[in-house]
Amino acid sequence: MIIMVIIFLVLLFWENEVNDEAVMSTLEHLHVDYPQNDVPVPARYCNHMIIQRVIREPDHTCKKEHVFIHERPRKINGICISPKKVACQNLSAIFCFQSETKFKMTVCQLIEGTRYPACRYHYSPTEGFVLVTCDDLRPDSFLGYVK
C-alpha cells in the first residue's frame, strides 16, 4: 500500500512538472503582456519582464532580442483567421499569418551580459503587424513583426 502511494505521488509530481514546462513555453507566457505591467521606471521594464518570465536561450545565455505584445490574447488568437497568410521565411512548409492591424509592443534589445540572469536590455516601445504560425487556429509561435 505504501509503495502504491509513493508511486502515485511520483507520477503526480512528474505530471505537474511537465505541465509547468508546457505553460512556460506558450506564446502567451513568452510574448503577451496585457495589460502592460506597470514597472515604476519604464527603462527597467525589459529587465523586469525577462527575469519574471524567465526568458532565455536553451543554453541559459541571454536572448539578443525579445518582444512583448500589449494586446488581449483573444485579439492575438484572431491573427490565425487573418486573410494575410504568407509563406514563412526559412520554413518552407509552414504558413505564417500576419495581423491585420498594428499592435503595441515593447522590443527588448540586449545591451549587456551573456549568461542569464545577468542580462541587461534596452527598452523600445513600438507598433507593428505581428507574424505568427498557427496550430488548430491558435498562435503557436511568434516569428516577429513588420513595422
UniProtKB/Swiss-Prot annotation:
Alphabetical list of InterPro entries matching this protein: RNaseA, RNaseA-like_dom_sf, RNaseA_domain
Keywords of this entry: Secreted, Signal
GO molecular function: nucleic acid binding; RNA nuclease activity
Chief site of localization: secreted
Gene Ontology BP terms: defense response to Gram-positive bacterium
Signal peptide: 1-20
UniProt cross-references to CDD domains, sorted A to Z: RNase_A
GO CC aspect terms: extracellular region
Regions crossing the membrane: none
Location in the cell: Secreted
A Pfam match: RnaseA
Function: Does not exhibit any ribonuclease activity.
PANTHER family named among the record's database cross-references: INACTIVE RIBONUCLEASE-LIKE PROTEIN 12-RELATED (PTHR11437:SF20), RIBONUCLEASE (PTHR11437)
Stated family: Belongs to the pancreatic ribonuclease family.
Protein name: Probable inactive ribonuclease-like protein 12
Record organism: Homo sapiens (Human)
